[in-house]
């Protein structure tokens, strides 16, 4: 389909800033709806190698399948079927939760090189002339009946709405705040401007295959202030990350930056840390193909939009990689925004592109997505601190509750995944498993109560632990 054909079918024009997973997925969604759009990417290429990888869970997989893309991704990595967990006292346990998730939903959990994800999204995109690289955005101008985005080379792109899919260092977020401060002082709160904080850093790496790390399995190795998580391909790569607690908490944008030397230094400091019985961090580093180190911002904004500007993905909610939901949450954002834009595009030109219509749409977008994104963010935050044994409570929960809470963890995972958002105007695949029908997207998620429910489970275990220690002391 040519660009002209898209324009004939929809007068609505969307400017997407950021050739990210969120941005390119939104472009695919809009192409399916014949909504005119353009993608502006500041880098010279869409898919650079940065050493990072992405976990795709059933909630993200279902959206990619709606777009006809999932088979391309599934072929890149064997599904995860077994999780192995290791604690510093030598205790280990295994869980087939990933296999059960696949059986219930019809989609496995897979981990893929982020470069490959972006490459596939771009190569399968039908209107490549709509994706422009070397387009660093300098400012956004509100035009009353539209909006204009000006890039570093002096080009101006006009549309009805600007979507900031440009990540944690979002230029569009900065412009949204600037314009709101100029026109409606106080609308953007100081809390939102300081919403992103950093307490952890992470070394992401991709290594050559190590024989003792079996394909289709992944390992979580926990310690105090540190965790290492690996995913193992078949005759291929090992994806891994080392997450470490930093000495002090900082607030974005005054957060640390790290070099390749920093990544090497961290991995050298933890070289003897055991990932498994036979593999240490030094083995992952010695066999690495690429690696990078980054600060891990965490936070979620209370205001996602202003006027004709809206944020999605990491530009509005940022989480650690511990529960693998960052990219999946961005995919859900894209699916909901595209569904609302599709509905809007069916109105008359005047009604569909008016300031009132845009404000109503963006209000609905945030109200639809906020609670679920906030719950996912909070669960990720809790997961990072559970995995790094951040305090006594989380240490005890991780060691004495988590290994024995399999059915409850499964139940909560199923409910969370089954209530995920999707593209409303595209059909589902026949491969959908039975779990999707067990809950509707209108069912309230319970993710936000994770710490309280875990504490309730912990108390009996804690009393038993103390009783055992007391008996041991008395008998000695």
From Swiss-Prot:
GO terms for biological process: terpenoid biosynthetic process. FAD binds at residues 41, 55, 114, 314, 327. Gene3D superfamilies: FAD/NAD(P)-binding domain. It is an enzyme of class 1 (oxidoreductase). One of its GO terms (cellular component) is membrane. It is a single-pass membrane protein. Its cofactor is FAD. Belongs to the paxM FAD-dependent monooxygenase family. This is FAD-dependent monooxygenase prhF. The lineage of its organism: Eukaryota, Fungi, Dikarya, Ascomycota, Pezizomycotina.
